[in-house]
Amino acid sequence: EAVKAVMCREYGPPEALKVEDVRPAEMGIDDVRIRTQYAGVNYPDIVITAGRYHWKPTCPFVPGLECSGVAIEIGKAVTHLRKGDRVMASIDPKFITSTGYGSLAEEVVAPASQTFKIPDSMSFRDAAAIPIAYGTSYHALFDRGGLREDEILLVLGAAGGVGLAAID
């Protein structure tokens, strides 16, 4: 059964994107199918759909790097999530490149390694805004920057999502 999704049929401005009926993404044993409640739109989404990102999905594709929703199908190898869990997910651009599917759809298939339970106290709306900003900030500070607990950090340009996440 078809689902609604934003489609990028050719690289260009956001106005070129269209909502269409598409076949649902295929599941792997390490994946989670999510009934989307909210999906974030980030600067890389604009760059990817314009064809200016270092990974270029083959058109047509469904863009989108993050979402929140309810897990409706769990891959056989996934052990940390259950059907019905409230989840948030990050969709790596490499995953979109290999599958053609991102998070701007009614149903999203995400790698279980990038899918996390949402705390009961958090809304779907707030959860959808976390994966990219916080993931990017964490990667920059700890994986790339080697920040340690005893160090002091000055964050410049903290008005955006990644900068605010770094302060947090």
Predicted feature residues:
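Cytochrome P450 core scaffold surrounding the K-helix E-X-X-R motif
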Residues: 44-50
